[in-house]
Swiss-Prot record:
It comes from Danio rerio (Zebrafish). PROSITE patterns: BRCT, HELICASE_ATP_BIND_1, HELICASE_CTER, MACRO. ATP binds at residues 60-67. It is an enzyme of class 3 (hydrolase). Residues 877-907 have a biased composition (Low complexity). Residues 340-494 form the Helicase C-terminal domain. PANTHER family: CHROMODOMAIN-HELICASE-DNA-BINDING PROTEIN 1-LIKE. This is Chromodomain-helicase-DNA-binding protein 1-like. The macro domain mediates non-covalent poly(ADP-ribose)-binding and recruitment to DNA damage sites. Mediates auto-inhibition of ATPase activity by interacting with the N-terminal ATPase module, encompassing the helicase ATP-binding domain and helicase C-terminal domain. Binding to poly-ADP-ribosylated histones upon DNA damage releases the auto-inhibition by the macro domain and trigger ATPase activity. Does not bind monomeric ADP-ribose and mono-ADP-ribose fails to release the auto-inhibition of the ATPase module by the macro domain. It catalyses: ATP + H2O = ADP + phosphate + H(+). Pfam families: Helicase_C (PF00271), LIG3_BRCT (PF16759), SNF2-rel_dom (PF00176). It is found in: Nucleus; Chromosome.
Length: 1026
């Protein structure tokens, strides 16, 4: 008997039978839910754990109701044990709102405080709690817990609940160490994957919930005690006895058989000719990695990642997408995967299905989002870049509105996210860890789902995806065995089995068939035959399908029983690549080396080093092919042109019909709401008001008359300098309908209540299309003695679903200025603009100024551009009708002391929104300073870093003039990583051996640099691997 089993028996009494009933829980405040039998058993088990233990792990499979069981435990603690709190619940940001709603719905007698928000809001919450500490549950996120750990440590928590507790699998992590310092009576860990990788992670969870038995320093003893579990079967039962008091796990197949059936299948696709060219080129890029025995694993992993990107979409490589970058069929035709997905989504939409679409790569999500926009599919998106409030809104919209597709990264949002509105899950590409894919699929197939669910995986035939997938199959089967039978050491063997084959051999898989032809292998498929039939938006089950097609009964019976994510056609692809693959690859190597030797003799170096992008031209070996005659070439060209013209015409007709239908619906909606649009009418380019564009050839020199010159003013554009005429103030906004803060947004709000009111109303009524101009008076608070002031809001920017703001679109600005010209002419008004886009990096002020001059000044509209001096109590009224522009004239762009037309540097920019920075920076003078560049020369390669954390750090790094490298190379100066296992340690040692110039540091170094606004010494942050 091991010391661990002895300690468990000495310290943890046997659990008695619980007499707890659901009526008891209802009496103590639980309501609006009927617990299933297994859920009530779970609450009983949790209540018994509270009597004699410091903590426990509720490890039910995803979707079985761990949240409601935990809420029931809190109701029990308050009602039966007379605990009035405080209880602390930690969860991911994406499911925090779900926790709040379910706490209020299932147990309204528990008062809940959501501890979130910015620093000021949290300080206010702390003050309120200090004056009135009467609450039961404090609900917050891991990030807030780490930020305000000192404050949260001051409380004595009766119960601590950690949702998605696999975040604690590393006992050296900051979250694990921080929570250990809290004063806690009982700890509850919730995780659908209590065992993911190895015994160290299991012990990390155990030492967190029961530190008196599982001492932190005894982790090696625990691993050694059960390392030989396969050769000593007696250890299996012993390990079960150690875990049994602390871990409860049920799976859907055992306790939720009433859930609608989940069917899972793999659909293969070919590759386009472009993808095949890049696939071959990637394999040939780093030849030494395949030839030498000393090649590092990192170089091969780089090749592996590039191959995965190639199979997804070739546009993931810079320089591949043809210019100009316009949406078109080329986006679909360039990728075999997207070609198949295109057909599949059309079939699914026609059948009334709703889809979760997963990808590992955020750049692939960008391409998919472009595609969905192009096809006109309704969608929501959620990945690491989406803010918390936007996430909740996206989830709510998908669940309550008729949204066709939810676009997600596999790990985004947390595994507790409920998306049962979907009945179809599509994995564009798979995760190396099969547990992550299972968690993702469980967002749709969980309690609350009323329709059968279909899980579809898209795999590139004869590509790296096949063998990666088959290895995930192998790992998942071993993991299932471990969980069910207790043989935890098999997890380590699963890792070694997956890496037993040389990575260089894995990369050769399928090359014989894949590269036997350079033609596209994309084919049309019968989707009804592959995906199955559906009726009224629901997939038919095997039984229903058999009634429709008795001939398929035998086939359906064969598939039954193999209904899990990683059934792979009964084939074992984990074996070595075929002899044909090896032979084809060797022939490719020989040919490539021969070409390189010839090139070296001629003094040309053709071989690219590892890490170089694939944007350059690729070698495309000539094929022996009968040359076409001139007549045949002409015939082919004409056919292609005719087909392209036909597709374009049909697409244009469909687009026009859809626009007309949408317009009629919008007009009917506006009528029902009593809404009247303030948008200026569209200007007919051939109408009488549009004069010839002779201005395009006019030289803007000092010979311009005062009447046609732009006037440059030092003053406040919200109080235009006009005589007796009407004045139109111009401001650029985005299409989101959310009024900004700071800069011109705040100034306009002080001038009038109308700007925010009319803009947000137009946003609510979907009246903010790009190029629209809202025109309305702003004299409600302040007015001139003579003449009226109007505000023209040009919708010139776009904000996408990920809250990313575009630059000012000159085409939209051009259209808006045309409309303003017509309105100004009718009202005999002058036009007053801020210095649009000033100090915005890459902004085309020259083009903007030409548009203003073209549409306004040279056509007789009195036009003024304002510069605002910050820091002064009031704007200095100073103006001049200059015949030279600040952008092209040296005197006008001089320092404040040299010219009255320049403005002082801005004192504070923190209050400006991004939209304000782009469109209202007229409040910042030409002398505005740029961002700090203290990270210049720093090139960072991130290793084993969470995607959200990496994205955040990269954003700051680039802001301060540093660079992030996707591939390890001699340019890298710092490796920022996290070491969580011996495998990571070995890989990093190999990296540092190959690239000795790089320093291995903790992410805290970057955070310290950003916080102190200087490049700090790395001495305190270096990671020692010896």
């Amino acid at each position: 008997m091991s010391t661990f089993l002895r300690a468990v028996r000495d310290n943890i009494p046997e659990k008695d039978k619980s007499e707890l009933t659901e009526n008891d829980l209802k009496k103590w405040g639980l309501g609006a839910i009927h617990l299933r039998p297994y859920q009530l058993d779970g609450v009983k088990w949790l209540s018994l754990c509270m009597k004699n233990q410091q903590g426990c792990i509720l490890g039910d499979e995803m979707g079985l109701g761990k949240t409601c069981q935990t809420i029931s435990l809190l109701a029990y603690a308050r009602g039966s044990l007379k605990m009035n709190g405080p209880f602390l619940v930690l969860c991911p940001l994406a499911v925090l709102e779900n926790w709040r709603q379910e706490l209020e719905r299932f147990c309204p007698s528990l008062s809940v405080i959501c501890y979130t928000g910015d620093k000021e809001k949290r300080a206010e919450l702390q003050q309120n709690l200090k004056s009135d500490p009467r609450f039961h549950v404090l609900l917050t996120t891991y990030e807030m817990c780490l930020k305000d750990a000192r404050y949260l440590k001051s409380w004595k928590w009766k119960i601590l609940v950690v949702d998605e507790a696999h975040r604690l699998k590393n006992q050296e992590s900051l979250l694990h160490q921080t929570l250990k310092e809290f004063t806690v009576g009982f700890r509850v860990l919730l995780t659908g994957t209590p065992i993911q990788n190895n015994l160290q992670e299991v012990y990390s969870l155990l030492t967190f919930i029961q530190p008196s038995v599982f001492l932190p320093e005894a982790v090696e003893d625990f691993v050694n005690a059960y390392a030989d579990i396969q050769t000593e079967p007696a250890l299996v039962d012993e390990l079960h006895q150690v875990l049994q008091p602390f871990l409860l796990r049920r799976v859907k197949a055992e306790v939720a058989a009433e859930l609608p059936k989940k069917t899972e299948l793999v659909v293969f696709h070919g590759l386009s000719a472009l993808q095949k060219r890049y696939y071959k080129a990637i394999l040939m890029r780093d030849l030494d990695a395949f030839r030498t025995d000393q090649s590092t694993k990192t170089r091969l992993l780089n090749v592996l990642m590039q191959l995965r990107k190639c199979v997804d979409h070739p546009y993931l490589f810079d320089g591949v997408e043809p210019e100009p970058f316009e949406m078109g069929e080329h986006l679909v035709e360039a990728s075999g995967k997207l070609s198949l997905l295109d057909s599949m989504l059309a079939y699914l939409q026609e059948g009334g299905h709703h889809v979760l679409l997963f990808s590992q790569m955020t750049r692939m999500l960008d391409i998919l989002q472009d595609y969905l926009e192009y096809r006109g599919y309704s969608y929501e998106r959620l990945d690491g870049s989406v803010r918390g409030e936007e996430r909740n809104l996206a989830i709510k919209n998908f669940s309550t509105k008729d949204v066709f597709i939810f676009l997600l990264s596999t790990k985004a949002g947390g595994v507790g996210m409920n998306l049962t509105a979907a009945d179809t899950v599509i994995f564009v590409d798979g995760d190396f860890n099969p547990q992550n894919d299972l968690q993702a699929a469980a967002r749709a197939h969980r309690i609350g789902q009323t329709r059968p669910v279909k899980v579809i995986r898209l795999l590139g035939r004869d590509t790296i995806e096949e063998i990666i997938y088959s290895r995930a199959v192998s790992k998942l089967r071993l993991t299932d065995t471990v969980i069910e039978e207790g043989r935890f050491s098999l997890l380590d063997q699963a890792q070694s089995a997956a890496s037993g084959l040389q990575l260089s051999e894995i990369l050769k898989f399928g090359v014989d068939k894949l590269l036997s032809s350079e033609e596209s292998s994309v084919q049309d498929v019968d989707l009804q035959l592959i995906l199955g039939q559906s009726r009224d938006g629901q997939w038919l089950t095997d039984e229903e399908h058999a009634k429709l097609n008795e001939s398929n009964e035998e086939e359906d019976e064969d598939m039954e029983g193999q209904n899990h994510m990683y059934y792979f056609e009964g084939k074992d692809y984990s074996k070595d690549p075929s002899a044909e693959d090896e032979k084809t690859f060797e022939l490719l190597l020989e040919k490539q080396f021969a070409e390189m030797e010839d090139a070296e003799k001629e003094g040309r170096a053709l071989r690219n080093k590892a890490g170089v992008s694939l944007s350059g031209p690729l070698i495309n070996p000539a094929r022996k092919k009968r040359p076409l005659t001139e007549a045949e070439l002409e015939e082919r060209r004409q056919k292609r042109q005719a087909a392209a013209a036909k597709r374009a015409k049909l697409q244009e007709e469909r687009k026009k019909q859809q626009e007309e239908l949408n317009y009629k619906k919008k007009m009917a909606w506006w009528d029902s709401c009593g809404y009247r649009s303030l948008c200026l009418p569209r200007v007919d380019s051939e109408g009488e008001d549009m004069e010839p564009d002779e201005d395009d050839h006019v030289s803007f020199s000092s010979t311009d008359s005062d009447h046609t010159a732009i006037r440059y003013v030092l003053g406040d554009v919200t109080h235009p300098q006009a005589d007796r005429e009407d004045a139109i103030i111009v401001h650029c906004v985005d299409d989101s309908g959310h009024w900004g803060r700071g800069g011109l947004f705040t100034a306009l709000g002080l001038r009038s209540d109308e700007p925010r009111k009319q803009y947000e109303l137009a946003g609510d009524m979907k009246d903010l299309e790009l190029g629209n101009v809202l025109l309305f008076p702003v004299d409600d608070k302040q007015s001139r003695l003579c003449g009226r002031d109007y505000l023209a809001l040009i919708v010139a920017q776009q904000r996408d679903k990920a809250n990313k703001l575009s630059g000012i679109r000159l085409t939209a600005l051009d259209e808006g200025l045309k409309k303003i010209y017509k309105a100004a002419k009718q009202k005999k008004a002058s036009v007053h603009l801020p210095r649009i886009g000033h100090s915005t990096k890459g902004f085309n002020w020259y083009g903007t100024e030409r548009l203003i001059r073209k549409h306004l000044a040279t056509r007789g509209i009195f036009t003024s551009i304002y510069y605002y001096r910050r820091g002064s109590s009031h704007a200095t009224v100073s103006s001049t009708a200059s015949t030279t522009t600040p952008s092209s004239s040296k005197p006008a762009a001089s320092s404040p002391s040299e010219s009255p037309h320049s403005s002082s540097p801005p004192a504070n920019r923190e209050g400006l929104t991004k939209s304000a920075e782009l469109s209202t920076t007229s409040h910042e003078g030409p002398g505005a300073p740029g961002l700090a560049d203290f990270m210049r020369g720093v090139h960072v390669y991130f290793y084993n870093m969470a995607a959200t954390e990496k994205k955040k750090l990269t954003r700051y790094l680039i802001t301060y003039d540093g660079d992030e490298e996707d591939l390890m190379s001699s340019h890298v100066t710092h490796i920022v990583g996290e070491v969580e296992s011996p495998v990571h340690k070995q890989e990093l040692q190999d990296l540092l051996h190959q690239y000795p110039q790089a320093l291995l540091v903790k992410k805290n170094w970057l955070e310290s640099c950003f916080a102190s606004q200087r490049k700090v010494s790395v001495s305190k942050y270096v990671i020692r691997l010896t």
